[in-house]
Amino acid sequence: MANFLLPRGTSSFRRFTRESLAAIEKRMAEKQARGSTTLQESREGLPEEEAPRPQLDLQASKKLPDLYGNPPQELIGEPLEDLDPFYSTQKTFIVLNKGKTIFRFSATNALYVLSPFHPIRRAAVKILVHSLFNMLIMCTILTNCVFMAQHDPPPWTKYVEYTFTAIYTFESLVKILARGFCLHAFTFLRDPWNWLDFSVIIMAYTTEFVDLGNVSALRTFRVLRALKTISVISGLKTIVGALIQSVKKLADVMVLTVFCLSVFALIGLQLFMGNLRHKCVRNFTALNGTNGSVEADGLVWESLDLYLSDPENYLLKNGTSDVLLCGNSSDAGTCPEGYRCLKAGENPDHGYTSFDSFAWAFLALFRLMTQDCWERLYQQTLRSAGKIYMIFFMLVIFLGSFYLVNLILAVVAMAYEEQNQATIAETEEKEKRFQEAMEMLKKEHEALTIRGVDTVSRSSLEMSPLAPVNSHERRSKRRKRMSSGTEECGEDRLPKSDSEDGPRAMNHLSLTRGLSRTSMKPRSSRGSIFTFRRRDLGSEADFADDENSTAGESESHHTSLLVPWPLRRTSAQGQPSPGTSAPGHALHGKKNSTVDCNGVVSLLGAGDPEATSPGSHLLRPVMLEHPPDTTTPSEEPGGPQMLTSQAPCVDGFEEPGARQRALSAVSVLTSALEELEESRHKCPPCWNRLAQRYLIWECCPLWMSIKQGVKLVVMDPFTDLTITMCIVLNTLFMALEHYNMTSEFEEMLQVGNLVFTGIFTAEMTFKIIALDPYYYFQQGWNIFDSIIVILSLMELGLSRMSNLSVLRSFRLLRVFKLAKSWPTLNTLIKIIGNSVGALGNLTLVLAIIVFIFAVVGMQLFGKNYSELRDSDSGLLPRWHMMDFFHAFLIIFRILCGEWIETMWDCMEVSGQSLCLLVFLLVMVIGNLVVLNLFLALLLSSFSADNLTAPDEDREMNNLQLALARIQRGLRFVKRTTWDFCCGLLRQRPQKPAALAAQGQLPSCIATPYSPPPPETEKVPPTRKETRFEEGEQPGQGTPGDPEPVCVPIAVAESDTDDQEEDEENSLGTEEESSKQQESQPVSGGPEAPPDSRTWSQVSATASSEAEASASQADWRQQWKAEPQAPGCGETPEDSCSEGSTADMTNTAELLEQIPDLGQDVKDPEDCFTEGCVRRCPCCAVDTTQAPGKVWWRLRKTCYHIVEHSWFETFIIFMILLSSGALAFEDIYLEERKTIKVLLEYADKMFTYVFVLEMLLKWVAYGFKKYFTNAWCWLDFLIVDVSLVSLVANTLGFAEMGPIKSLRTLRALRPLRALSRFEGMRVVVNALVGAIPSIMNVLLVCLIFWLIFSIMGVNLFAGKFGRCINQTEGDLPLNYTIVNNKSQCESLNLTGELYWTKVKVNFDNVGAGYLALLQVATFKGWMDIMYAAVDSRGYEEQPQWEYNLYMYIYFVIFIIFGSFFTLNLFIGVIIDNFNQQKKKLGGQDIFMTEEQKKYYNAMKKLGSKKPQKPIPRPLNKYQGFIFDIVTKQAFDVTIMFLICLNMVTMMVETDDQSPEKINILAKINLLFVAIFTGECIVKLAALRHYYFTNSWNIFDFVVVILSIVGTVLSDIIQKYFFSPTLFRVIRLARIGRILRLIRGAKGIRTLLFALMMSLPALFNIGLLLFLVMFIYSIFGMANFAYVKWEAGIDDMFNFQTFANSMLCLFQITTSAGWDGLLSPILNTGPPYCDPTLPNSNGSRGDCGSPAVGILFFTTYIIISFLIVVNMYIAIILENFSVATEESTEPLSEDDFDMFYEIWEKFDPEATQFIEYSVLSDFADALSEPLRIAKPNQISLINMDLPMVSGDRIHCMDILFAFTKRVLGESGEMDALKIQMEEKFMAANPSKISYEPITTTLRRKHEEVSAMVIQRAFRRHLLQRSLKHASFLFRQQAGSGLSEEDAPEREGLIAYVMSENFSRPLGPPSSSSISSTSFPPSYDSVTRATSDNLQVRGSDYSHSEDLADFPPSPDRDRESIV
C-alpha cells in the first residue's frame, strides 16, 4: 500500500535504484504466482477482476500533471521510479525533462550490456530528454529540407549531406544507447516512427558506400526525412493517425471502386477498342498493286503502312495541333471532302488515351471518375464511336464519378467523426474516473471526520489533491511565465498546454454550465474542499484566489473549485466597462463549438443547465444538493453542509493503486483548471496597472463632458448605419477601377479614397476618445478597424514615393468590415477561421506531403525534362519539375484534380511506370484522402443554423435599430399625412398602438393570430404594421421612443417558414384550402376569434412574419428562458411558443381536416378578394337571381372539368408535346418547309389550348385563388409569352428584335411540367427551401471574390494584351521584336500584325469575376494564369514567365476562393436537407435512439413472410441434382467461373495475333457451354420453379443471348455491336455473391446506400434533365450560328437539340465550359465575320458576350453547384443511414436467414411450427438470433403463445427472439401490436388464431401437476404410515379399538384391509362409497372452475414474467 500512496510534492519522485529494480522483480514474481491461481479461478467460472490499464495522463511524451508538483532540479534527466501503478510489475523507469515531459524507458539492459545504472546509458538518457536535442534535430530536418529543395546543388553540398547523415546517426545512436535496440517494450525499434529514421540512415550509408547504379532513385528516399517532422511534433502524430484510420476505412470503398471501374473498363474495352485510332487521312491513289506504293498530291510512298503512319497526311482539328478523329457509324464524326476515315497511326495524347487494352481502358475510366479533362476523352470517343455512347458516359459520370468519389468523402468524414467521438469518449472516461476519485476521497474525508481528525489543518495530498503546489510556488511560476512573455494578452483566448490530455480535454468537458451570469456574487463561506453546498441557481463561487488567501492554502479552499473560468466573476483589474460585454461568457445558451489544433471539435459554454453535451453532468454527483434534514447544529444554515454517511467506509483504498489512479484522474482536470485560472490574468499585473493608468483618460470634468458628447454620437445607431454605408460606397469605388480609365475618373477615385480614409480615421479617433484606448482595444472589430486605418494612412504616405499596389490591396480588407453588420459573412469568416484553426495540423501534414512529392518529382524526373526544351526558343514546357517551385506547382495542380496532362508529359520524358506510380499516389493520397479530410472538417464546422440564425452582437442590433428608427419616422410621416387627409373627411378610429400605450390591451405580445387593426381595412398596403418591424427589439427601444412595440410570439426562421408557406400557399394544397375557406365565415373585425381567419390569410401572415429579421433570435431565446410572460396566458389560443417557430394551430390536425372538407365541398370559391368587392361592388354577383345562377352553374361546370383527372392528363400531354415541338426549331428548320409549317400550326394550337386552360381555371377557381398560387403564376406568364408572340406574328411584327427575344422565352414551357410531376416537385420544394441559404452563401462568395477581383484588376488590368502575327497562327511575337501596343500598331503595315487581348481578363471587376469563376472551376484557368505569369507591364508585349511568382495569387485564390467557398454550397445544401427531413419526417424527432432501433427492426420484420421452399423432386436423379444446385458451394463455383470469364475478356487487346484470337474464341465457347450447362441443370432440378427467381431469368436471358451472339457473331458485329457486351452484363451476378459472403458487409452497406439513394437520385436526374432541356432550347435560339472554334465544332455545338444536349451534359460537371464560351465572346473581326449570311436570314457568326456569360454562369451555378451538390448531399445522407443500419444489432439479412431456416421446419408455409421442434429451430439459426442448446429454459421463459396442437406462430417466435437481441424495453408492446397489424396486412392469409396457452404457462401447468402429485403422494404415504403403525400396534395387542383407527373408510383403509389378513371394520361394501375416493380431477375443476378461471385470465394477461419465476431446482427436475 505504501508504494501507491505517494505524498505530495517532491517526495513523489524517487530515484530509480537497484533496490527499485529488485522491488519490481519481486512484484513480478508475486503477480506470476497470482496469475496461476486466477487461471484456476477462471476455469471454475469465478469472476475475474478487471485488468489494470495504463493511465491516460501518465503516458509517454505527455506532460506530467501538476498534481505531482515540480520535480527538484537534481532529479531532472535522472531515472525515476514509474509513477503509473500499471507499470509497477514491469521493468520500466521514467525520466522527466525541464518541460516535465514524461519519457519512459525499459529497465532491462540495453544492447545486453548497458544496465540502467551504467554511466554511458545515463549520459545518453540525459542527452535524449534534453529539449535542445529535440530542437537540434528539428532544425537539422528543416535545413536538410531546404538543401533537398535545390534543383541544381553546388558540389560542396555533398559535405553538408555528410553532416546531416552524421547528425541523424548520432541521434539514432543516442536513442539506441538510451533505450535499447528492439527486444523489450519502449526500446528503439518498438516505436514505428523510429523505423523511418533507421531506414533513412541505412539508405544514406548504402548509397554512399555501395555502387547501386541508379543512385538518384535511391537518393529520393532521403526526402522521407521530412516525415521525421511528424515524429517530432506530437500533434501531427494524431492527425496522421486519423489519416491512417480513414485509409483503413476506405478499404471497402476502394474494393468497390476498383470493381466498378473494372466493369466499366471492360465495357469500354468491348465498345471502343481501336476506335480512337480512326483519323481523317488525305485521299490517295494506289499505284501498281505489286509493291503496294501509294501516291498523294504528287508524292509517292513506298507502302500503304508508311503512308498511314506519316502525320503529314492527317487532318488537324481547327486551330489546334490535335488530329481530327472520325468514325464509321452513322452518328460518329465525319471527314471533309478530300479525306477518308481510316485506322492509322497511334492513339491521341502521345498514344496514352485509348481503350485498346484493359490497362489503358482502366486508366481512362479512372480519369473519367476523377473528372480530369474528361470532356476531351468524351469528345474523342463520341467523335470516333457515335453520339449514342453519351449514355455510357452518363452512367460512368453519375454512378462512377459522383457516387464513388463522394463515397470516399463520406467515409473520410465518418472516420473523422468517429475519431471525434473517441476523443469525447476518452474525456467521459476521465470524467468517470474523476468522479470515482472524488467519491473515494470524500469517503476518506468522512471517515477522518468521524474519527475526529482535524482535516482542516492537514495539507497533505490526501486532503488537498486539487491544490497541488503551494501558493508561493505557483505565484513564482506565474511570475516566471510573465517575465518570459509566454502569457498571452490576446482577447478571449483559450489556453493551450503541452499536455494534450490537460486543458485541451477541458474543452470537451462542457463544464461551462452557464448559470445566470447577472446574479453571480462571490461567497465568503469557506470550508474544506469536500464540503458540499446547496446550489442555488443565482449564485456561483469563485476560484480560490492565491493573492487574497490570507491563511494560506492549507487552511481552506473556496467551495466551488470546479466552476470553470468563463463563468467566474471577472477580477477587479479586468472589470469590463458597462459599455462592453465581458468576453468569454456563453451567451444565450448557444453552444459554441470550437475546434482545437487537432481538428477536434469541442463544445464550450452551454447556457442550458441540463446541457446534453458529453461531460455536462460532470459536477452533478459531486456537488450534491443536500437534503435539509442532514444539517447539523454546528453548521450555519445556508452555509456549506458536510456530506456525512452513517457508516463511513474507506474500502475504496483496499485495492492497491486504486486511490493513486483516482487521484491521477482528478489531476487531469485540476491541472486544466489550474492553467485556466492562471490564464485569466491575461496580462502581467504591472502591465495592467500601466494600462489602467495611461490608457483610461479621465482627467478633468471638461474632458469628461466632451467624452460623453462624443460617446453619444459615436455609439448612436445612425453612426453605425452611416459607417456601413461608407464601407459599401468605398467598396463600390474600389470596384469601379478599370482598364483605360479617363484621368478625370481616376482623379475622382483618388479623391474618394482620401475622403473615405478620412471618414474611417475620424471614426477611429472619435471611438478612441469615447471609449478610452483601454476599452477600445479590447474589442476585436476595433483592433481590425485600427489596423486597416493605419495601413490606409501608410499607403497614402507611400503612394507619393512608389506605386505600391500591395498596400492598395490592404484597403480591400475594409470589405470585411461589412461582416460586423452582415451576420452571414461574419459566420462564414468564423467557419473559415475555425476550419483553419482545426486544419492547422492537417495543413502541416498536407504541406509535408506536397513538399515530399515535389522533391521526389524533382529528384526523379527533373533532369529528364530538359529533353522537352523547345528546339527554337530553348524554353522548357510550362509544367516541368526542373526546380522546386515548378515541381510544387505540378503537385498543387494534381491536388486541384488535374493530373492527367502533366502525367502524359512526364511519361514522355521519364517512362510510364514510375510516372504512373508517383502521379496516382499524389492523386489518391493528396486529393482523395487528405483533401476529403479537409472537406470533412469544413462540413463539421459548418452548420446551417449558423447561416440562418446567426449570433447577434451589439453593433448589428445598432444597425437594425437605426433602420427601425427610419421606418418609424417614415411611418409617422405617412400616418400624419393620412390622418390629416382622413380628418378632413371623417372621424378617425383610435390606434391600437395608442391603446397599448394607455394599457388597454391585455398584453404587448401580439400573436400572429391577432386580428389586423382597423387601419389595415382602409389601407391594405400598411398591413405590415401589425407585425414587428424589421430591426426593432422589444423593450430595447431607443431613448425617447414613446410607444411600446407589439411583437409576435415567435418569428419563424426565414428558410423554413418560406418553405412551409410555399408548400401551403402554392404547391398543390390550394384546392383544399379553398374548400376550407368556403366553410368558414370570413371576418376581419377585431372581435373575430383567432380561428375565424381563413387559411390563406394565416399563410399570408406567416409569410409576412417570415420576412422579420433574424435579430429577434436574441429575444426569442430570452423568451424561451423566462417561465411565463405576463399576460401570456390570457388568450387561450395563443399559448407561449417555446421554439423559434410558432405553430398557429396544430398544423397536422389542420392538414388532416382538409381532405375531409374537400369531400363535402365541391364548389368554387369567390372570384375576387374582399378588397376588390369592397371597392367595386359590381364584382359581387348575386347567385340567387337568374343571371347570377347561370354564372354560378357555369363556374361549377368549369370547376368539375378542371378538377377532373383526365383534364390534368390532357394538359400534361399538351405540355410535353409543346416542349417537344421546341426541340425541332433548329438550324435546319428553314430547309424543312413542311415541318416549319406544321410547327407554326402546332404552336398556335398549343397557345389556344393553354389560353383556354387558363380561362377555364379563372372561371373555376376565381382570380383570388388562381393568382395566389405560385405555380399558376408560372403558367400564366408562360401562356402570356406565347400569346404575345402569336399576336405579333399575326400583326407581322415577328422579325422585331424584342419579339424575337420574347420568343426564346417559350423555352420555359417545360417548367410547367414541374408542378405536375410529384418527384420533381419534391426536389424543387427542397430547393426552394434552400434558396435563402444558397443566396446567402452566393452573396458571401461574391464578396470574397470581389476582393480577389479588385486585386486582380490592380495587378493585371491592361497587361493581358499581346501582338500577334496572323500568318503564323496565334503565337505572340517575341518581345524583343515588338515591345508594346503602340509599336505593334505602327508595324501593322500589311494588316497581318494586330494587338489582341486574352478574352477572359482582369480589365474590370466584372471581367475579373468571370476569370475567377474559370479559375475556381479549373476550366480555362491555364490561359489566364499563363497570361498573368507572362505579363510585363501596362500594354506591353508579354515575356515567358517574366512574372513567375504571380502563380501564388492564383494558389491563394484557389485555396480560399474555390476550396472554401464552393464547398460551402455542399454544406448549405446538406444542412438544408436535414432541416427538410426534420420538418417532414416527424417520427424521427420524437423517437429516442432506443425506440429507433426497435422501430427499424420492426420495419424490416414486418415486410417479410415465410415462403414455401421449392419442393425437392421425387425422382432420384432429379433429387440428386437438386441437392447439388441448392448448395451454396455451387453458387460460389459459378461466381468463380464468371470472374474467370472476365479475366479472359481482360486479356483481349486491339491488334492481337491470329493465334490469340483463336485461343480466346475457344475459351469463350467453353464458357458459353459451361453457363448453358448450368442453365440446363438448374432447369432440370428446379423445373418450373426455376423462373420464380429473377436472377435465374436474368441468367437465362444472358445464356440465350450468348448462344445467339456466338452463332450469329459475324452478322451482329457487322450491323450492331460486339456481342461480348452480353458477357459483361453477366458481371451483375456478382451482386448475388455479396449476399452469401458475410465478410463483404462493408461493400453491402455501400451498395445498400446506393439502392436507398436511387429514388431520390432519379428525381434529381429528372430535374437536371429539365434544366438541360430548357437551356438547350435557349442555346439553340441564341448560339446556333457562332463560329466553330475552341470547344465548338461540327459535333459539339448549339445547332440542333441533340448537339446542345451533348454540350450541356458535358458542362454539368463544369467540364470544358470555357471552350464553349470562348467563341461566344467574339464580337468582331478578326475573330469573326459579322456579315456572314445565315440560313434563317440573320447575319454573322459572332456571339453575344453578355448573353453567353449569363447563360453559362447561371447554368453552372444551377447544375454544377446546386443540383449536383444535392446529389452529393443525398449520397452522404444515405451512406450515414446505411452505416447506421449495418451497425444495428439486427439487419435485413438476419430476418432473411430466419425465414430461410423457417422454410426447412415449415415446408408447407403454414406459418406455424410444433413446440417440440422449437429447440432445434432456435439452435439452427445463425447469430445473433440463435439460441444454442441447451435452450429449453430460455425458450420457456419467453412465454410464447401456443395454439391447439401445440403449435407456435412464426411472428411470435421472431418477435421474442428480436426482443432477446435488443433487450427489454417499455416500447416493445406498442410495437408488437403495430407489427402484428402490419403482418396481417402483408399476409391476409394468416390464420386468425386464438392462443390457448403459452410455453411458460404450459411449463407452469406441468410443474404444478407434478408438485400436486408429489404432495398428494407424500400425504398418502403419511396417512398410510399412520394407519400401518396403528395396525401394527393393534396386532401387538395394545388394546386399540376400531374407533381409534386413523383410517376407518376410504382408499387407504380398503387397501390395507385387503393386504392384511384381518379386515378392519365391517366387510360391507357400502362402506366404500364413491365419496371416499379422493375427488376426481373433473369434480375439482367443476367445483372451483370460477376461481381457476379468474386466476388463469389474470395470469394470461400478466405482463411481468418475474411474477412466476421458475425455481432452478424445479427446472432441473423438469429436464430430468
UniProtKB/Swiss-Prot annotation:
Q: Where is the composition biased (Polar residues)?
A: 509-528, 570-580, 1981-1990
Region: Interaction with NEDD4, NEDD4L and WWP2, residue numbers? 1974-1977
Q: What is the effect of changing residue 1408 to R?
A: In SSS1 and BRGDA1
Q: What is the effect of changing residue 1712 to S?
A: In BRGDA1; uncertain significance
> Changing residue 175 to N: what effect?
In BRGDA1; uncertain significance
Which of the residues are on side Extracellular? 150-157, 210-216, 273-357, 379-386, 738-746, 797-806, 861-884, 904-912, 1226-1236, 1292-1297, 1356-1400, 1423-1445, 1548-1558, 1613-1619, 1680-1697, 1715-1745
Effect after changing residue 941 to N: In LQT3; also in SIDS
On this chain, the residues bearing Phosphothreonine are 38, 486
Q: Which GO terms describe its cellular component?
A: caveola; cell surface; endoplasmic reticulum; intercalated disc; lateral plasma membrane; membrane; nucleolus; nucleoplasm
Q: What is the effect of changing residue 1652 to T?
A: In LQT3; uncertain significance
* Designated name of the protein: Sodium channel protein type 5 subunit alpha
Say which species the protein is native to: Homo sapiens
